[in-house]
Amino acid sequence: MADEEIRQKALAFIEALGGSDNIKEIEGCITRLRGTLADPAKVDVAKLSKLKIVGRPMLMGDGIQIVVGTHAELIGTEINNILRGQ
């Protein structure tokens, strides 16, 4: 996956997760994005589904896990770069 494609995917995940203010923490781990959200109700499951995730996102309290495939670590890193203004 090209750098620009990773960036666009990361931006789409940020939007689907309720925006940058809703993401407290996120990381990529092998095939999953794992994170903590300020308000899980802001997650747009329909938007996540359009991002070709595997199955449904798993919401547990304020935590979320999303199976995204082998690019999870790249996407997670890029989400964090965007959240830090890079």
Q: What does each of the following model-derived ranges do?
A:
Residues 3-86:
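Membrane-embedded alpha-helical signal segments
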